[in-house]
Design a protein with these regions (language model features):
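Short alpha-helical segments used as structural interaction elements across diverse proteins
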Residues: 1-4, 20
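Glycine-rich beta-strand-turn "strand-cap" elements at beta-sheet edges
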Residues: 2, 40-50, 77-105
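Residues at secondary-structure transition points
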Residues: 12-14, 32, 41-44
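Residue-level signal for secondary-structure boundary sites
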Residues: 14-16, 62-64, 100-102
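An amphipathic, aromatic/His-enriched active-site/gating alpha helix that lines ligand/cofactor pockets
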Residues: 21-37, 57-93
Length: 105
């Protein structure tokens, strides 16, 4: 299993609207892509901003390509992201999941 990690930052007052936008765009597309095993959305308040960390879980890099295209390290953005995000970080990170709930043996 592979974890794909994307990070973004919004103004604190945009948190709820951006989360709703994420659910209607990226999270919806993740769920519709073959091989997606689920997504965690983590947030934290830092000063007047909200940091978002999305951890999407995938069966394989080939499945991630079904979502992101051949250049899997490139972040995927949607049209209104630029209205919310303070910075459009161009890349994401991928990690092999070494231990997950239910797999500790």
């Amino acid at each position: 299993m592979i974890g794909r990690i994307w990070k973004g930052v919004t103004k604190k007052e945009d948190t709820k609207r951006y989360l709703a936008y994420l659910k209607a765009t990226g999270l919806k597309e993740y769920a519709a892509t073959k091989g997606n095993l689920g997504t965690y959305v983590l947030t934290q308040q830092v000063g007047g901003n909200t940091e978002f960390l999305l951890l999407s879980l995938w069966r394989s890099m080939d499945d991630i390509k079904g979502f992101a295209g051949e250049e899997v390290e490139k972040a995927v953005y949607y049209p209104a992201d630029k209205e919310f995000l303070l910075d459009m970080v161009p890349t994401v990170d991928h990690y092999e999941i070494a231990v997950a709930p239910g797999t500790q043996g």
